[in-house]
Amino acid sequence: MARMHTRKRGRSGSKRIEVRERPSWIQYSDDEIKEMIVKMRKQGMTKSMIGIRLRDQYAIPGTRPVLHMKLGQVLKENNLESDVPEDLQALIERYKRAMKHLSLNKHDMNNKRKAQLIMSKMLRLIRYYKRTSRLPQDWSLERVLQ
């Protein structure tokens, strides 16, 4: 499938193996894994960073076969889910960096175009999240950007 704002094709990548039962090498109980997730989230880590740390340091390939629930559901149970979805938050930070660069380099037209593409991607995501009720209908991007 093609990329959104370019004529290039997408990148191929490895797919995660579908595992339905708990792997035998995991030495942590369900409660210990949930405590690790909550602790990492309270340290300020995002969901993807938590998943990477669980995979690389604790040899837990995913929370679904182990806990029978997704990582976001564990965070939702403990009221630690962020108000803004992670992918939208990353786009907002990218846009802020691009605008900071543009304020210092006013004639950088390539970066101006990239900032426009980031903004259109953010607006598309916001429409989707409002439609699926992940964001409230009165949520405003302007409040976040200032």
UniProtKB/Swiss-Prot annotation:
What are the protein's UniProt keywords?
Ribonucleoprotein, Ribosomal protein
Which is a GO BP term held by this UniProt record?
translation
Listed GO CC annotations:
cytosolic small ribosomal subunit
Entry keyword Ribosomal protein: yes
**SMART domains cross-referenced by the UniProt entry:** Ribosomal_S13_N, Ribosomal_S15
In terms of CDD domains, this protein maps to:
Ribosomal_S15p_S13e
Q: Which GO terms describe its molecular function?
A: small ribosomal subunit rRNA binding; structural constituent of ribosome
PANTHER family per UniProt: RIBOSOMAL PROTEIN S15P/S13E, SMALL RIBOSOMAL SUBUNIT PROTEIN US15
The cross-references to HAMAP family, in alphabetical order and at most eight, read: Ribosomal_uS15_A
Subunit structure as annotated in this protein's UniProt entry? Part of the 30S ribosomal subunit.
**Similarity-based family:** Belongs to the universal ribosomal protein uS15 family.
| Name of the molecule in the record | Small ribosomal subunit protein uS15
